[in-house]
Amino acid sequence: MYEKILFCADLYASSDYAFASALDLAERSEAELIIIHVLESRHRYSGQVITEDGEVWGSEEIYDKLKGVLKEYYFSRIEEENPENIRIVVKGGVPWVEILRFARKEKVDLIVMGSYTIKDPKKGPEVEKPHLGENAQQVTLRARCQVFTVTSPKQQLNFKRNNDRS
């Protein structure tokens, strides 16, 4: 069915559902799974990145460290210790542009992305509203392959069945 699947990692927990879907599709199709993360250009040119732990990464080590963080994070969710059919790529630039450029260059069959979530204060902290951010919108509109956008279970609509048909 698919030969190459591109999963767009945005480092938010909500994209874990998208990763699980991408991994499942890759396993079923015996496809290569490529995990890509694009570090936005405003960070790339600042010369350094400060993590939330206060660690400072210099510009030359940003991509290597980020690739290591992604490998540790995603490989811990896979049963195999060192899967051969999974590759991690880190790029710098405008995320949707770099995702599309990479997908075209690699002749990707499917792009899998998570949706952006917005907490709904009117309905409580547990209710999330699905939202397509700029990157998901642009990738969906411009990709030359299929795009699969995955929401978390908290984002699913809850329809009540009306059995009274008068």
What do these predicted regions represent?
Residues M1-E55, N85, S166:
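Small/aliphatic-rich secondary-structure junction motif
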Residues L23, F75-S76, Q137-Q138:
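Active-site phosphate/pyrophosphate- and oxyanion-stabilizing loops and adjacent acidic/basic residues
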Residues I78-I118, K154-L157, R165-S166:
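Structural beta-alpha unit
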Residues R104-F159:
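Gly/Ser-rich helix-loop-strand patches that form or flank binding pockets
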Residues I36, R87-K91, F148:
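General small-molecule cofactor/ligand-binding pocket signal
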Residues E72-R87, A143-V147:
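A structural motif corresponding to the C-terminal end of an alpha-helix
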Residues D53-V69, P125, K129:
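A short acidic, glycine-rich active-site loop
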Residues A18, Y45-Q48, L100-R101, K123-G124, ...:
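Short, well-ordered secondary-structure micro-motifs
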